[in-house]
Regions:
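Axial heme c-ligation environment in periplasmic c-type cytochrome domains
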Residues: 31-46, 60-95
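Short sequence/structural segments immediately N-terminal
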Residues: 11-19, 68, 95-97
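Intrinsic disorder/low-complexity segments
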Residues: 4-6, 47, 97
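The canonical Cys-X-X-Cys-His
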Residues: 16-26, 88
Length: 97
């Protein structure tokens, strides 16, 4: 993608499917085999989403998440642009009920 180019909803969904869905699920509930193993939060629950800001979500998506020495999520900096990461955060926000 070109820097600063705006992504379509289909582009954002494709990024979700490629990079996020294996653990977080198509619906954001985290009830996949990997999601259950890693105890991924259910993003359809608004209270779970209120526990993190957009900036925190962007940082985790960019840099990854660790618990001690254990990697819970790889970072996507270098694979996804800053705009693609922000768009994924907006996509996650739409799961909340």
């Amino acid at each position: 993608f070109l820097a600063g180019a705006s992504l379509t909803a289909a582009d954002v969904k494709a990024n979700w499917e490629k990079h996020c869905q294996k653990c977080h699920g198509a619906d954001g509930k985290g009830q996949t085999t990997m999601g259950k193993k890693l105890k991924v939060k259910d993003y359809t629950v608004a209270a779970e989403q209120k526990k993190f800001t957009d900036e925190e979500a962007n940082k985790i998506t960019s840099e990854g998440k660790k618990e001690g020495d254990k990697s819970l999520m790889k970072g996507f900096k270098g694979e996804l642009s800053e705009q693609e990461i922000k768009d994924l955060t907006a996509y996650v926000r739409k799961f909340a009920k």
